Amino acid sequence: MRAFKVTRDTNETKIHLELNIDGTGKYAIKTGIAFFDHVLSSFAKHGAFDLKLDVLGDLEIDDHHTVEDVGIVLGKAFENMEKKNIKRFGWAIIPMDEAKATVSIDIGGRPYVVGNYTPNTEKIGNFSTENVVHFFESFSNNAKINLHFEVTGENEHHKVEALFKAFGVAMDMATHVDERKGIVSTKGVI
């Protein structure tokens, strides 16, 4: 079983995360940001990851530290994963009504993000849309994953939700175990 617990305790956030990569899509997420909980739940469900996340953040300031630190902690959980026999690459194209999100992932030990997301609104509930790209940068830097994404559409809720669903599907594909693979790198290490 590939299950991990990660805790982060700073002056800005207190986070406890439990992740089972080989889960069934069960989730219990409490970040204090309702829409963020919603899209993280979509990530877990569509990635078939069991995810428990308890966060106490300085939301009286804004949601930046909470979103950033969740990306850091989730990234660290995936970085802890044994890389032997994983498929390494994952991708997904997910529609949601008028919106469409494309995500491509390489779990190759090289963090890099190329994101094409332009918000039409500043907020979805109490979630700042400017933090979408920052979440993925925080995740990528800590998971050491190369991540490309592109989102089109009009409805901000649909765009961001489609993106997190595509993220879950692509991560599920990339983390899937294939015993034939060994270390999927000509270098012999990831």
Swiss-Prot record:
It holds the Pfam family IGPD. Keywords: Amino-acid biosynthesis, Cytoplasm, Histidine biosynthesis, Lyase. It is found in: Cytoplasm. InterPro entries: IGPD_sf, ImidazoleglycerolP_deHydtase, ImidazoleglycerP_deHydtase_CS, Ribosomal_Su5_D2-typ_SF. One of its GO terms (biological process) is L-histidine biosynthetic process. GO terms for molecular function: imidazoleglycerol-phosphate dehydratase activity. Its main location: cytoplasm. It is an enzyme of class 4 (lyase). Its EC number is 4.2.1.19. Pathway: Amino-acid biosynthesis; L-histidine biosynthesis; L-histidine from 5-phospho-alpha-D-ribose 1-diphosphate: step 6/9. SUPFAM superfamilies: Ribosomal protein S5 domain 2-like. The keyword Magnesium does not apply. CDD domains: IGPD (cd07914). It catalyses: D-erythro-1-(imidazol-4-yl)glycerol 3-phosphate = 3-(imidazol-4-yl)-2-oxopropyl phosphate + H2O. It comes from the Archaea. One of its GO terms (cellular component) is cytoplasm. Belongs to the imidazoleglycerol-phosphate dehydratase family. This is Imidazoleglycerol-phosphate dehydratase. The gene is hisB.
